């Protein structure tokens, strides 16, 4: 390898490492957003957004352009009921899951897509609390300012919000039924050594492909509860 070829390879490796570091930083940023959103921590949420002319947050309540508008939303909420967010039983969990991130070639901007899923608890004026589940998609644009990745544009698209007892399909279309599990082992599409499946929590532990990252020990998955007895 010539000195020139070696220099080119080093340059290429530096670019690859930088891209991986950018992706890691963006993941950290997005996950922090989810944790702050759980309790509507307005100051922390606002800090994650870039101070930029393109800064934008788009949700069902509307489009909030500029960092100041984003800050007003997080401080006041959609209807100005700040007391609700400070209620000890308020919960707005939106786990940031399955992120797919693409960094621009110049390393200054990026885009990401995430699932948002979690449990909610919204205190009501009558003293009761409205629990539910929510699921949606985030499409996010990021920008690097001063070497720090920040949120530039966040779009939240709700897929469903379901009250705790009603499920996430319309009542008139809902039909509760049990799946036939475990499936028929004689089914030609399922070999006899296929993994176990259960309808309810049963003590079944899905096998791990990896060993313990600290001890290197293979994880024991043979421990199960059956008929009230522990089986090894």
Question: What role is predicted for each listed range?
Answer:
Residues 24, 90-92, 131-133:
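Transmembrane beta-barrel outer-membrane domains
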């Amino acid at each position: 390898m010539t000195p020139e070829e070696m220099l080119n390879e080093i340059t290429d490796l530096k670019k690859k490492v930088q891209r991986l570091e950018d992706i890691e930083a963006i993941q950290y940023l997005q996950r922090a957003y989810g944790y702050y959103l759980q309790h509507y921590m307005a100051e922390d949420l606002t800090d994650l957004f870039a101070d930029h002319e393109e800064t934008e947050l788009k949700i069902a309540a509307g489009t909030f352009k500029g960092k100041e508008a984003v800050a007003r939303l997080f401080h006041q909420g959609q209807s100005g009921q700040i007391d609700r967010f400070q209620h000890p039983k308020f919960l707005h969990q939106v786990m940031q899951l399955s992120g797919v991130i693409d960094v621009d070639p110049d390393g200054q901007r990026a885009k990401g897509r995430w699932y948002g899923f979690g449990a909610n608890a919204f205190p009501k004026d009558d003293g009761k609390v409205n629990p539910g589940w929510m699921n949606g998609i985030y499409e996010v644009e990021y920008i690097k300012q001063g070497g720090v990745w920040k949120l530039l544009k966040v779009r939240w698209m709700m897929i469903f919000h379901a009250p705790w007892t009603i499920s996430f399909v319309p009542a008139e279309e809902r039909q509760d039924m049990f799946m036939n599990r475990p499936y028929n082992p004689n089914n030609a599409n399922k070999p006899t050594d296929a993994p176990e499946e259960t309808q309810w929590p049963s003590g079944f532990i899905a096998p791990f492909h990896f060993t313990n990252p600290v001890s290197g020990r293979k994880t024991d998955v043979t421990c199960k509860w059956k008929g009230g007895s522990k089986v090894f």
